[in-house]
Regions:
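Conserved nucleotide-binding/hydrolysis micro-motifs of P-loop NTPases
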Residues: 57-61, 92-94, 126-129, 148-151, ...
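Short alpha-helix plus adjacent loop in nuclease-associated cores
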Residues: 148-167
């Protein structure tokens, strides 16, 4: 079987014989040297892809914010199994309509990619189909934008049939407008009537039709899954439903495991949870259902929001939301705003909400952002105040917010009993309002505290 090489020059094969021997001499030279060595060994491990990151922020954006966004993009790349080698930043009033970055920056990226043998370039924004084609033609490596990277991570995380269908639908919707020029054979024609002389149907038309048919099939399948999920949720009548919401990687699954004593997958990576998980919990004879839902993120692809309708219905139909925030993250306030905006988009922003700040054990009020190599045109915010202490934040948020606020550490189990007590009070109050005859031994006095 012929070996296929990707755009970055790496070779992949199903054979256990690696393209390069373990004497650190890669490629054809390494194979020739290995032939002369009967004791030569081969590294059969799958090589991780390497990438550079590219961001085009507004000229007024502070450097600390730009770095924060690139840190998140690097975390996404790491979650997808990619090693990030370098970061490129170009400040423009607006991205170049043809190649997103300017001509000089594109030449700089190309020189670095060729010199280091990089296999992928990842952009922190969505690229148009024409920009994608122009960049691939110029850089001759794989080009990935933010949406495709997130969709790829979702594809690796999805376990249930519903989640897999949702991700596949998002993939096809992303692919459809980008079919032109995707394969070299698309200029050929297929068909042409009985005499084979007509213009026929070009392969691009055929491929588009195949993708559209697949999208229609997946939408029908998801409608069936929605009906099943709706039936399951209807069968949960008579019990209060609570949903954990928040930015990705804030510790929702860890909290879920603590409260429900279950074993939901939790990992220090983005989008560890894609499938929603529901557990029945009872505190002080007050039963309720707790849902762990998919995390939100800045610039979450609209296709994913649309595709994950049935999963997000767990949030829409919840009686109480627990908004979990990673207080150790320097941009946690922006993350709160992103989650609130996404809740508005899915029409769930008007629900009762508890705000829970997690990871207080990792909070550092004097942490300064370290500068990364590869930045140019620095635009530092010299007037930015020092981060407040944890005590100052507690006083501030407890004073200015009407909703209850709690500060915890799920990892270190700090203030978890307080979280249980807070949940119990609010769930019991909702339960008493809706189902006054089903609270068992829980007293009305406790509910009304």
């Amino acid at each position: 079987m012929a070996k296929k090489s990707n755009a970055g020059g790496r070779q992949h094969t199903n054979s256990t014989r690696h393209p390069g021997a373990t004497d650190n001499i890669p490629g054809r030279v390494g194979r020739l040297l290995a032939k002369g060595n009967k004791d030569a060994t081969y590294d059969t491990a799958v090589q991780r892809e390497t990438a550079v990151l590219v961001a085009v922020p507004d000229k007024r954006q502070a450097d600390a914010r730009t770095q924060e966004y690139l840190d998140e993009l690097a975390f996404l790349a790491e979650t997808a199994g990619v090693d990030v080698q370098h970061r490129f930043v170009q400040r423009l009033d607006k991205p170049d309509i043809r190649t997103f970055v300017g001509e000089g920056k594109l030449a700089e990226i190309k020189a670095y990619v060729m010199h280091k043998g990089i296999s992928m370039v990842i952009f922190d924004d969505d690229l148009s189909p024409s920009q994608l084609r122009n960049l691939e033609a110029e850089l001759t490596v794989k080009i990935v934008d933010r949406s495709l990277l997130i969709i790829d991570i979702f594809a690796t995380r999805a376990k249930s049939a519903t989640a897999r269908a949702q991700v596949e639908l998002a993939q096809y919707q992303y692919l459809l407008p980008r079919l032109t020029g995707l394969w070299s054979h698309l200029d050929k024609q297929r068909g042409g009537g009985v005499s084979q002389r007509g213009p026929g149907e070009t392969e691009i038309e055929t491929d588009r039709r195949v993708v559209r048919d697949r999208i229609a099939l997946l939408k029908d399948k998801l409608k069936d899954f929605d009906k099943q999920s709706h039936t399951q949720r209807k069968s949960r009548g008579g019990i209060v439903r609570v949903a954990l919401v928040g930015y990705t990687n804030v510790g929702k699954s860890t909290i879920m495991n603590l409260l429900s004593r279950s074993d939901v997958f939790a990992e220090n990576k983005l989008f560890a949870t894609v499938d929603s998980t529901v557990r029945k919990i009872s505190f002080d004879n007050v039963p309720f259902l707790l849902s762990d839902t998919v995390g939100f993120i800045r610039k979450l692809p609209t296709r994913l929001i649309e595709s994950f309708k049935s999963t997000l219905d767990e949030i829409r139909e919840a009686d109480l939301l627990v908004h979990v925030v990673d207080i150790s993250h320097p941009g946690f306030e922006e993350q709160i705003a992103v989650v609130n905006e996404t809740l508005k988009d899915i029409e769930a922003a008007d629900k009762p909400m508890l705000l829970v700040f997690n990871k207080i054990d990792q909070y550092r009020h004097d942490t300064e952002m370290e500068k990364q190599a590869g930045f140019e045109g620095m635009n530092e915010d010299e007037d930015a105040p020092q981060r407040p202490t944890l005590a100052q934040l507690q006083a501030t948020y407890m004073a200015k917010l009407h909703d209850p606020v709690l500060f915890i550490s799920a990892q270190e189990r700090e203030n978890i009993d307080e979280l249980r007590a807070l949940l119990t009070r609010h769930v019991a109050k909702l339960h008493y309002q809706r189902y006054p005859n089903s609270l068992g031994d829980f007293s009305v006095e406790s509910v009304e505290e």
